[in-house]
Amino acid sequence: MQYVIPAPRQAAIDVVGTDAKFPVRRIWCVGRNYADHAREMGHDPNREPPFFFAKPSDAIVPNNSTIAYPAQTKDLHHEIELVICIGKGGKNIPQDKALDYVFGYALGLDMTRRDLQSDAKKLQRPWEMGKSFDESCPITAVQPADKIGHPKAGAIWLKVNGEVKQKGDLNQQIWQIDEAIAYLSTFVALEPGDIIMIGTPAGVGPCKAGDTLEGHCDGVGDLKVTYRAA
């Protein structure tokens, strides 16, 4: 097929154990999927269930990258998250079959321009500019599910310059992996290459130019990204 302009670059993630890549189609995110994080953001998890939003696939940043501090913000926040990588497409997926649609798992950061997000919320406007910006999704290589299984519990944490800022356990998620997949598939058809960032534990906070962020999730991997000094 010929195009009238250069075709966009295909976003892709490394896969552990192979030179082949995981092509990324869409990035879905689950908001407020840990009760303690919902509360720190001023919301009642018993009254306001988690929800979905999206990032562009070209926001992905490879593990161990050094990147620029993003434009138009003075309050960049870290949110460490388990990432589900979809390997088979479907819609209205039954919850008891949902794990069959998973290719593997990774660890990612949903970087957030919190000031832009907060301002948009106050004005009742969409807050894509707070979430969907360049290099806002650092991510590890994918661990195939047929190698590691489906993580239901395990420590997940994030350090900034060696100091622990976020700490939780995967079993604290309000929606577990199968629930999130099944529910999202009632809104949109999931396709191979879609990824789902399934929420962050409490402790989100700011980082600045020159900071190094290190994340970990038991059984999934370790993530590191550095923001270039100003």
Predicted regions and their residues:
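Generic structural signal for residues positioned in beta-strands
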Residues: F52, T66, V83, G104-A106, ...
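Catalytic-pocket segment enriched in acidic/His residues
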Residues: Q2-K21, N33, H37-P45, R114-A230
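Structural beta-strand/beta-sheet cores of well-ordered domains, especially the beta-sheet scaffolds
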Residues: R26, P49, L82, L107, ...
